[in-house]
Curated annotation (Swiss-Prot):
It comes from Saccharomyces cerevisiae (strain ATCC 204508 / S288c). The lineage of its organism: Eukaryota, Fungi, Dikarya, Ascomycota, Saccharomycotina. GO terms for cellular component: cytoplasm; nucleus; protein-containing complex. The gene is POC4. This is Proteasome chaperone 4. Component of the 20S proteasome chaperone. Forms a heterodimer with IRC25 that binds to proteasome precursors. Interacts with POP2. Keywords: Chaperone, Cytoplasm.
Length: 148
């Protein structure tokens, strides 16, 4: 079970409109086994002057269904099952982690863990405005690293 861990800071192209993201990803080094999960830790970049550290806000797990075992699945439905391993009272954070894990698991056909980390003082409303931006940037990073 060979994995590689990468750490990236994803800068915004438009400056202040989208936040800078910190992403740590653990990816399979060998793409033959579809059982090795993709793991992401994602959060907004924190200023170096802040002395408080980010904390775990939500931890979500998603796994693709075996298509040959579930022939009766309706087309158009999700082929991924997921569950929060650590839930949060904030729906915005949970939805972000759930969408990321589900989309990544379906796109790369392997299990996926997504961790969202944030400061206690962080405003989760930033997630609503930047939901698609965060998804796109994380998917682009994974496509590049996994060679797809």
């Amino acid at each position: 079970m060979l994995v590689k861990t990468i750490s990236r800071t994803i800068e915004s192209e438009s400056g202040f409109l989208q936040p800078t993201l910190d992403v740590i990803a653990t990816l399979p080094a060998d793409d033959r086994s579809k059982k090795i999960p993709i793991s992401l830790v994602v959060g907004f970049k924190q200023e170096a002057s802040l002395n408080s550290s980010s904390s775990l806000s939500c931890y979500y797990y998603a796994i693709p269904l075996m298509r040959d075992r579930h022939i009766n699945l309706k087309s158009g439905g999700s082929n991924v099952v997921g569950i929060p391993l650590l839930d949060t009272k904030d729906d915005r954070i949970r939805d972000m982690a759930r969408h990321m894990a589900t989309i990544i698991s379906e796109r790369f056909n392997r299990p996926c863990y997504v961790t969202w980390s944030s400061l206690p003082s962080e405003d989760p409303s930033m997630l609503v405005a930047n939901h698609l931006y965060i998804l796109k940037k994380c998917l682009d990073l994974l496509k590049t690293e996994l060679g797809e």
